[in-house]
Swiss-Prot record:
GO terms for molecular function: ATP binding; ATP hydrolysis activity; ATP-dependent protein folding chaperone; unfolded protein binding. GO terms for cellular component: cytosol; perinuclear region of cytoplasm; plasma membrane; protein-containing complex. Keywords: ATP-binding, Chaperone, Cytoplasm, Nucleotide-binding, Stress response. This is Putative heat shock protein HSP 90-beta 4. Gene3D superfamilies: 3.30.230.80, 3.40.50.11260, Heat shock protein 90, C-terminal domain (1.20.120.790), Histidine kinase-like ATPase, C-terminal domain (3.30.565.10). Putative molecular chaperone that may promote the maturation, structural maintenance and proper regulation of specific target proteins. Residues 197-248 are annotated as: Disordered. Residues 200-216 have a biased composition (Acidic residues). It comes from Homo sapiens (Human). Its main location: cytoplasm.
Length: 505
């Protein structure tokens, strides 16, 4: 058991978060069942989680008013590692798609053994009270509990190890609740034993005793005793003696008073609620400066899966990747579909390491020769000249910019097609698509692009290299570290020069 616990968890404080999550699950279950059977709440209608530290006995107790557990639940859920009661519950209520269930006493329950030995006492609505006890070994005991009777509650008692008493401190409990389950859907309260010093006088100390005497004196005849002036002066000069005592009491404090306002309609949220939320979240005393409300996650609508004209389901997240988007079928808008969906496919190529090759067949782009029409990569490859070894592309801000670029002069002269990439996503995703149909993709703005040359062109290049060798050396000395090297290029036609980047930049 110790090996399993320490394998799952490296941070000990996670145990409180896990136990609160389990308690929240139990509360969600009883709340759900009470919708159809109100008698489920006969044992108490308040749904809450209480945290009770006891430093004197080194015990930390968590009590929730959730669904509770039967004897069979204790054996099946607590007695079997990682068995999830919530999983079984969700199987019984599959139609409940909006209730979030994490896992009632699954592996998270065993995180308690990071800091403690464990006792769980529970009572279900329909059974007597049982106690389940285990010390992180391979065995546990289960017996009828004749201690303090509880209603529908589940009480989890942690007998902390000697070196783990820090988890009983008020500061730590509040810090963990604020960090993790602060906005959980049920009330979380901590019960703290306070012992402040109080200064009292001798008269106050004896007040309790005198109250009884005064009660008896009321029944006796009253007599008036008039003292002398000397006695009055003496009383005035006498000062009351005081001393300090410690007064014990239990303080209950709600730890999650601020509710998750982001789950509500912005029109229903007041400025006062926004202010309370801001101060609770930031621990600030000042008022917030301004409020900006905007949705960061929209509900998907109008998506349905139908087979043979029969509706199957509305939610199918696992069936379609996020990058796949659809428009209603309209043959007249096929061109628009190509323009829109082609760019979404680029995103899919970057995100989907399995299907990127299939998605690349859906890509459409403008090219040098296509004009206003778009060309697929498959059509591009089929029209490539025999001497062309790579798929040429150029990235720019817009189609007009790349069409007039000096980088495509030689390609145009030789009649090679160049793919125009003028969308922001193109440069980001082309890094993943390094080849298509056996042809590598190479940008004309980078070095390494080889264009076919005849014998005459090769001879001219050799002569030019010799003729302008000193000029290239001088240009490199002038530019120094601003460039890696200066060379003669056959890729220019009318432009005097151009700057290219390295292949892997």
């Amino acid at each position: 058991m110790s090996l399993i616990i320490n394998t799952f968890y490296s941070n000990k404080e996670i145990f409180l978060q896990e136990l609160i999550s389990n308690a929240s699950d139990a509360l969600d279950k009883i709340r759900y069942e009470s919708l159809t059977d109100p008698s489920k709440l006969d044992g108490g209608k308040e749904l809450k989680i209480d945290i009770i530290p006891n430093p004197r006995e080194c015990i930390l107790t968590l009590v929730n008013t959730g669904i509770g557990m039967t004897k069979a639940d204790l054996i099946n859920n607590l007695g079997a590692i990682a068995k999830s009661g919530t999983e079984a519950f969700m199987e019984a209520f599959q139609s409940c798609a909006e209730i979030s269930m994490i896992g009632q006493f699954g592996v998270g329950f065993y995180s308690a053994y990071l800091v403690a030995e464990k006792v769980a006492i529970t009572k279900h609505n329909d059974e007597e009270q049982y106690s389940w006890v285990s010390s992180a070994g391979s065995s546990f005991t289960l017996h009828v509990d004749h201690g303090e009777p509880i209603d529908r509650d589940t009480k989890v008692i942690l007998h902390l190890k000697e070196d783990q008493t820090e988890y009983l401190e008020e500061r730590w409990v509040k810090e963990v609740v604020k960090k993790h389950p602060q906005f959980i859907g049920c009330l979380i309260a901590v019960y703290l034993e306070k012992e402040p010093e109080k200064e009292i006088s001798d008269d106050e100390e004896e007040k309790g005793e005198k109250e009884e005497e005064d009660k008896d004196d009321k029944e006796k005849p009253k007599t008036e005793d008039v003292g002398s002036d000397e006695e009055d002066d003496t009383d005035k000069n006498n000062k009351k003696k005081t001393k300090k005592i410690k007064e014990k009491y239990t303080d209950r404090e709600e730890l999650n008073q601020t509710k998750p306002i982001w789950t509500r309609n912005p029109d229903d949220i007041t400025q006062e609620e926004c202010g309370e939320f801001y101060k609770s979240l930031t621990s600030a005393w000042e008022d917030h400066l301004a409020v900006k409300q905007f949705p960061v996650e929209e509900q998907e609508e109008n998506e349905q899966l139908c087979v043979h004209h029969v509706w199957i389901m509305d939610s199918f997240d696992d069936l379609m990747p996020e990058y796949v988007g659809f428009v209603r079928e309209d043959k007249e808008n096929n061109k628009k579909l190509d323009e829109v969906f082609s760019k979404i496919s680029w995103l899919g190529i970057h995100e989907d390491s399995i299907n990127w090759r299939h998605l690349s067949e859906l890509l459409w782009s403008h090219t040098f020769q296509s004009g206003d029409e778009m060309t697929s990569l498959s059509e591009y490859v089929s029209c490539m000249k025999e001497a062309q070894k790579s798929i040429c592309d150029i990235i720019g801000e817009c189609k007009e910019q790349v069409a007039n670029s000096a980088f495509v002069e030689q390609e145009w002269k030789k009649g090679f097609e160049v793919i125009y990439m003028s969308e922001p996503i193109d440069e980001y995703c082309v890094q993943q698509l390094k080849e298509f149909d056996g042809k590598s993709l190479l940008s004309v703005t980078k070095e390494g692009l080889e264009l076919p040359e005849d014998e005459e062109e090769k001879k001219i290049m050799e002569e030019s290299n010799v003729k302008f060798e000193n000029l290239c050396r001088l240009m490199k000395e002038i530019l120094d570290k601003k460039v890696e090297r200066v060379t003669i290029s056959s890729r220019l036609v009318s432009s005097p020069c151009r700057i290219v980047t390295s292949t892997y930049s």
